[in-house]
From Swiss-Prot:
Belongs to the LDH/MDH superfamily. MDH type 3 family. GO terms for molecular function: L-lactate dehydrogenase activity; L-malate dehydrogenase (NAD+) activity. The gene is mdh. Pfam families: Ldh_1_C, Ldh_1_N. One of its GO terms (biological process) is lactate metabolic process. CDD domains: LDH-like_MDH. This is Malate dehydrogenase. It is an enzyme of class 1 (oxidoreductase). It comes from Rhodopseudomonas palustris (strain HaA2). NAD(+) binds at G10, S11, G12, Q13, I14, G15, D34, N96, I119, T120, N121.
Length: 322
């Protein structure tokens, strides 16, 4: 049985980390694509040379032409300009929108049946643009956002309670930015909801609010620490979880930026919500109940995403005709 082919568009920090993780998990053969000559080839060779030590079998190829991604089962897009200190995700919009148009055309021509995961920021607008540019079914194009944001929330909670991260579940919905919505009500430790843990004296509401704020600013915190780039280990791990659920038909319930067409009262936009990912792509959108402040925060987040999408429409009106 032939191995799946996984194409990585962009061979920077996230792209290289993705390639290595795919090898370690033996998810398939890897094609690293980048416009910079030598970079994808060098990283592919370096990772391939680690395979005898790490004990995995996979082929790694570096390329500067989209032809190399032909027939890929999964395409993960990291191409674009990374966020720098003091730069908001919104600042990246016009630059990375052009990148998504080029990438979308390449995927449409060479890997039209792939499951596509977008990581490029500003995420919710970029995955929307990528889907429009590629013309692919919306259920086969998703954005990596909620898995990462939820992982950060889970880690902070596990650290606060001094428990295993495996016993912490958490959901972060909405846009992948400052307006994201960490849902305390639906987050648990070994099945015990966070509000109950406050009542039990494990933490205070004020401390919980601080953790929620830290989650919202998780990406910026790392950008400010690194000073020369942005996070790549956790984003790569998050995208791998999504790709694995698709390739192995695991049907995991994961929060991702998914195309909404009426769900949650949202139309023609990508927003972070829980979905089931299986062999058909997004197989189900899970609509959970939100009320009060949670619903207000979600609606505010949707409004922020709408603003980015509207900006995309002004910059590239031709996307709407695709």
């Amino acid at each position: 049985m032939a191995r799946d082919k996984i194409a990585l568009i962009g061979s920077g920090q996230i792209g290289g980390t993705l390639a290595h993780m795919i090898g370690l998990k033996e998810l398939g053969d890897v094609v690293l694509f980048d416009i910079a000559e030598g970079v994808p080839q060098g990283k592919a060779l370096d990772i391939a040379e680690s395979s005898p030590v790490d004990g995995f079998d996979a082929n790694f190829t570096g390329a500067n032409s989209y032809e190399a991604i032909e027939g890929a089962s999964v395409v993960i897009v990291t191409a674009g300009v990374p966020r720098k200190p003091g730069m908001s995700r919104d600042d990246l919009l016009s630059i990375n929108l052009k990148v998504m148009e080029q990438v979308g055309a390449g995927i449409k021509k060479y890997a039209p049946d792939a499951f596509v995961i977008c990581i490029t920021n500003p995420l919710d607008a970029m995955v929307w643009a990528l889907q429009k540019a590629s013309g692919m079914p919306a259920k086969k194009v998703v954005g990596m956002a909620g898995v990462l944001d939820s992982a950060r929330f889970r880690y902070f909670l596990a650290d606060e309670f001094n428990v295993s991260v495996e016993d912490v579940t958490a959901f972060v919905l909405g846009g992948h930015g400052d307006t994201m919505v960490p849902l305390v009500k639906y987050s648990t430790v070994a099945g015990i909801p966070l509000p109950d843990l406050v009542k039990m004296g494990w933490t205070s509401q004020a401390r919980l609010d601080e953790i929620v704020d830290r989650t919202r600013n998780g990406g910026a915190e790392i950008v400010n620490l690194l000073k020369t780039g942005s996070a790549f280990y956790a984003p790569a791990a998050s995208a791998i979880a999504m790709a694995e659920s698709y390739l192995r038909d695991k049907k995991r319930v994961l929060p991702v930026a998914a195309y909404l067409n009426g769900e949650y009262g949202v139309k023609d936009m990508y927003v972070g919500v829980p979905v089931v990912i299986g062999a058909k792509g997004v197989e189900r959108i899970v609509e959970i109940e939100m009320a009060g402040k949670d619903r207000e925060a979600f609606d505010k987040s949707v409004g922020a995403v709408q603003g980015l999408v509207d900006a995309c429409k002004k910059i590239a009106p031709d996307l709407l005709g695709r």
